[in-house]
Design a protein with these regions (language model features):
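Conserved, structured core segments of small domains
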Residues: 1-96
Length: 96
């Protein structure tokens, strides 16, 4: 199951706190990339945030990926389930 996660650091987070925790998040993302849980990650320019595509086996695994992020308590995120265009097209054809 693939998910798009858009994460932005809360504006009220002090710069010192953010600067301390951000390197921990970088290491965490590297670990998830090695485990093949993160397929893609990008920094959102000018947003103090990131965009990830994660590939997990369950909602429990997704919760773990999100909950263990060092910036979990200092960020807001939106999560979108993803599917391929081909699967979406197949589902639409079945409806017609």
């Amino acid at each position: 199951m693939k998910f798009l996660i858009i994460q932005k650091v809360k504006q009220e987070v002090p710069l010192e706190k953010w600067a301390r925790v951000l390197p921990l998040q970088f290491k965490y993302f590297e670990k998830l990339e090695k485990e093949k849980l993160i397929e893609v990650d990008y920094h959102l320019i000018g947003q103090q945030g990131s965009m990830l595509i994660v590939n997990v086996d369950s909602d429990e695994a997704l919760s773990k990926v999100i909950g263990e992020d060092p910036l979990f308590f200092h960020s807001e995120r939106k999560i979108y389930p993803l599917t391929t265009r081909q699967i979406h097209e197949k589902q639409i054809r079945q409806l017609l």
